[in-house]
């Protein structure tokens, strides 16, 4: 099974094992399942099996209520949280692993950019720091490398890894 609470560690363990593409596939299936059920935020608890006969959040069909009839970490019928910090793993995983933004010393003075695109062709995002926003755009090139463009405040030193072209 998959757990919203443990998902960051599960996804990171896959990436550590060189399986970033598999981690992204799991992320798309699991968190994408919430989106298919009508989520606009990520939930405290979720099980893919709930989608089989469950009604979308914005419908009143005869199907069971995904929101009210489930939840391993709440009282059934009392509804679990539909916007919960346990489900924040995708934001950290995508920033740290896919975009590869790593803090190399306290205070954000040195940041490394070591993207792991997995099966993606490109990724882009922003990372807030005390000195301003670091913006990163990564794209796979024909020679198997990753092209990286970034913008960072002048107070921040950026380091990139091997296999990355600027």
Language-model features, listed with the residues they occupy:
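Well-ordered alpha-helical segments within folded domains of soluble proteins
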Residues: 2-16, 86-96
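Non-catalytic C-terminal accessory modules of carbohydrate-active enzymes
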Residues: 21-166
């Amino acid at each position: 099974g998959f757990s919203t609470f443990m998902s960051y560690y599960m996804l990171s363990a896959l990436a550590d094992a060189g399986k970033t593409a598999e981690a992204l596939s799991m992320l798309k299936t699991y968190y994408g399942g919430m989106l298919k059920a009508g989520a606009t935020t990520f939930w405290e608890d979720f099980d893919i099996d709930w989608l089989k006969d469950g009604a979308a959040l914005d419908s009143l069909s005869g199907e069971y209520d995904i929101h009210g009839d489930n939840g391993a970490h709440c009282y059934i019928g009392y509804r679990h949280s539909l916007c919960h910090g346990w489900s924040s793993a995708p934001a950290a995983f995508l920033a740290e692993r896919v975009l590869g933004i790593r803090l190399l010393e306290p205070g954000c003075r040195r940041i490394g950019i070591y993207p792991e695109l997995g099966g993606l062709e490109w990724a882009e995002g922003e990372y807030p720091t005390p000195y301003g926003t670091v913006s990163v755009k990564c794209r796979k090139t024909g020679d198997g490398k990753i092209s990286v463009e970034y913008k960072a405040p002048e107070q921040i030193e950026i380091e990139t890894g091997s296999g990355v072209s600027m």
